[in-house]
């Protein structure tokens, strides 16, 4: 099995990258892909850049050049579920765009034209992630992760997301684009991220302060998840 791992920022990939054995680097169109083995698993780790376009382009390059069997999206997210605190884990059941609106043509809010309303994460990967959470004794919430090209900082944008997606557990800027690409390629995916902020008026300050905490937690999750996947 080969696992593709995608993080947007340097801080979100550096801990994993530094542990890759026999590491080689491939740079294409501003995307950096690191290949080798991690915990005995063949991996291709992508630093995509921030936002939906960067994530979609990077995921496509990763799938075309490295042919991973599964995709794991890692990194940080803003918490929406009331029980989530900084460092907690979110696992996707599904992902949706929170900033897509073609409702004039009969689509659901958040649904891109010609696409499903949601992109479903793989059940086997979800189960492996939940097993990993139990093993590490982490607090986690499983559910809908929503994505858009905005860092959510303030009550107006937050209220809009809560109104349109009351079931959403977390918000970030890449996961749905990655799920969209994986859907088109027929490659299973899951989002496993750690909370860096709670998407409120002070979220930009919390993000800057706690990004390292989120990166450490999400990287630990991915490492342990790879071990679980390698066991089959």
UniProtKB/Swiss-Prot annotation:
Which positions form S-S bridges? none
Q: What is its EC number?
A: 3.2.2.9
Which amino acid positions bind substrate, per UniProt? 78, 152, 173-174
Q: Which GO terms describe its molecular function?
A: adenosylhomocysteine nucleosidase activity; methylthioadenosine nucleosidase activity
Family annotation (Gene3D superfamilies): Nucleoside phosphorylase domain (3.40.50.1580)
What CDD domains does the record tag this protein with? MTAN (cd09008)
| Catalytically driven reaction(s) | S-adenosyl-L-homocysteine + H2O = S-(5-deoxy-D-ribos-5-yl)-L-homocysteine + adenine; S-methyl-5'-thioadenosine + H2O = 5-(methylsulfanyl)-D-ribose + adenine; 5'-deoxyadenosine + H2O = 5-deoxy-D-ribose + adenine
Keyword Amino-acid biosynthesis listed? The answer is yes
What keywords does the record list, in alphabetical order?
Answer: Amino-acid biosynthesis, Hydrolase, Methionine biosynthesis
Keyword Amino-acid biosynthesis present in the record's keywords: the answer is yes
In terms of SUPFAM superfamilies, this protein maps to:
Purine and uridine phosphorylases (SSF53167)
Q: What does this protein do?
A: Catalyzes the irreversible cleavage of the glycosidic bond in both 5'-methylthioadenosine (MTA) and S-adenosylhomocysteine (SAH/AdoHcy) to adenine and the corresponding thioribose, 5'-methylthioribose and S-ribosylhomocysteine, respectively. Also cleaves 5'-deoxyadenosine, a toxic by-product of radical S-adenosylmethionine (SAM) enzymes, into 5-deoxyribose and adenine. Thus, is required for in vivo function of the radical SAM enzymes biotin synthase and lipoic acid synthase, that are inhibited by 5'-deoxyadenosine accumulation.
Q: Which family does it belong to?
A: Belongs to the PNP/UDP phosphorylase family. MtnN subfamily.
HAMAP family xref list? Salvage_MtnN
Question: By what name is this protein known?
Answer: 5'-methylthioadenosine/S-adenosylhomocysteine nucleosidase
Native organism? Cronobacter sakazakii (strain ATCC BAA-894)
């Amino acid at each position: 099995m080969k696992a593709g791992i995608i993080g947007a920022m340097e801080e979100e990939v550096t801990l994993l990258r530094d542990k890759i054995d026999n590491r080689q680097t491939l740079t294409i169109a501003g995307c950096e892909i690191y290949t080798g083995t991690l915990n005995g698993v063949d991996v291709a780790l992508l630093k995509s850049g921030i936002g939906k376009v960067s994530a979609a382009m990077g995921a496509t390059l990763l799938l075309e050049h490295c042919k991973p069997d599964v995709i794991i999206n890692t990194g940080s997210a803003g918490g929406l579920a009331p029980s989530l605190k900084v460092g907690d884990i979110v696992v996707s059941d599904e992902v949706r765009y929170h900033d897509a609106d073609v409702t004039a043509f009969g689509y659901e809010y958040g649904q891109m034209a010609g696409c499903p309303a949601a992109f479903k994460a793989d059940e086997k990967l979800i189960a492996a992630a939940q097993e990993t959470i139990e093993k590490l004794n982490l607090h986690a919430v499983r559910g809908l992760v929503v994505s858009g090209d905005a860092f959510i900082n303030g009550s107006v944008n937050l209220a809009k997301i809560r109104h349109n997606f009351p079931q959403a557990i977390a918000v970030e800027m890449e996961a749905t684009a990655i799920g969209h690409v994986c859907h088109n390629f027929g490659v299973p995916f899951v989002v496993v991220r750690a909370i860096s902020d709670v998407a409120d008026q002070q979220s930009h300050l919390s993000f800057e302060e706690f990004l390292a905490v989120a990166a450490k937690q999400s990287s630990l999750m991915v490492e342990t998840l790879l071990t679980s996947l390698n066991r089959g």
